[in-house]
């Protein structure tokens, strides 16, 4: 098990394959992705690497974090993430990961925070059909209807699909294909959509279920 990477979402475009078919891709850019710290079994009880990416202003970095970056001899990072790795894949502090960490055709799992939509109704949030447009229905055309309870059990069960805050949740999309990489510009092109807005930080790992596919 090896480390993943931290990348920033640039946006979407399309590329053409050898058959002349266009493939929609999401462009991810790697910006100074370095190993900031390591975790070992002897000291921490598990093996992992902590990566940092992007650039943070020194004045916006806490004194404790400035000390950590100074020990690692790296510039302050805007985003940190920890990856569990096997002992033989433990990287040295200061090691920089490039876009060629992944290969074209490889499957990856991508984690990001979805775009927030605010407070949304049941029709938009869960795809409910709503009530009738006429025949006695007034005001409640887009309501979710009954919450499905009576004297017993006398409550609404948890996780009942209702109106509420939509989006802005941490989501992992599995088994996305790496179309190509550009080491010089630090770009990774991934087939399909990736959760998050433009400029969002994205975690990219080797797919864990690719063997089943």
Swiss-Prot record:
Keywords: Methylation, Ribonucleoprotein, Ribosomal protein, RNA-binding, rRNA-binding. One of the primary rRNA binding proteins, it binds directly near the 3'-end of the 23S rRNA, where it nucleates assembly of the 50S subunit. Belongs to the universal ribosomal protein uL3 family. The keyword RNA-binding applies. SUPFAM superfamilies: Translation proteins. It holds the Pfam family Ribosomal_L3. Methylated by PrmB. Part of the 50S ribosomal subunit. Forms a cluster with proteins L14 and L19. GO terms for biological process: translation. This is Large ribosomal subunit protein uL3. The modification N5-methylglutamine is found at residue 151. HAMAP family: Ribosomal_uL3_B. GO terms for molecular function: rRNA binding; structural constituent of ribosome. The keyword Hydrolase does not apply. PROSITE patterns: RIBOSOMAL_L3. One of its GO terms (cellular component) is cytosolic large ribosomal subunit. Gene3D superfamilies: 3.30.160.810, Translation factors.
């Amino acid at each position: 098990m090896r480390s993943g990477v931290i990348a920033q979402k640039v946006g979407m475009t399309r590329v053409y394959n050898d058959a002349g078919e266009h493939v929609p891709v999401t462009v991810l850019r790697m910006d100074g992705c370095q190993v900031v710290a390591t975790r070992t079994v002897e000291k921490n009880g598990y093996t992992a690497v902590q990566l940092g990416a992007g650039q943070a202003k020194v004045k916006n970095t806490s004194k404790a974090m400035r000390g950590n970056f100074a020990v690692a001899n790296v510039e302050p990072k805007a985003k940190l993430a920890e990856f569990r790795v096997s002992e033989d894949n433990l990287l040295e502090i200061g090691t920089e990961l490039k876009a060629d960490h992944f290969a074209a055709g490889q499957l990856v799992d991508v984690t990001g925070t979805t775009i927030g939509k605010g407070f949304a109704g049941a029709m938009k949030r869960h795809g409910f059909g709503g009530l009738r447009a006429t025949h006695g229905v007034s005001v409640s055309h887009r309501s979710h209807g009954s919450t499905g309870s009576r004297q017993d059990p006398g409550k609404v069960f948890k996780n009942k699909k209702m109106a509420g805050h939509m989006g802005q949740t941490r989501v992992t999309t599995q088994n996305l294909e790496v179309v190509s990489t550009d080491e010089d510009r630090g770009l990774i092109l991934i087939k399909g959509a990736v959760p998050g807005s433009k400029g969002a930080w994205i975690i990219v790992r080797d797919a864990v279920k690719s063997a089943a596919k």
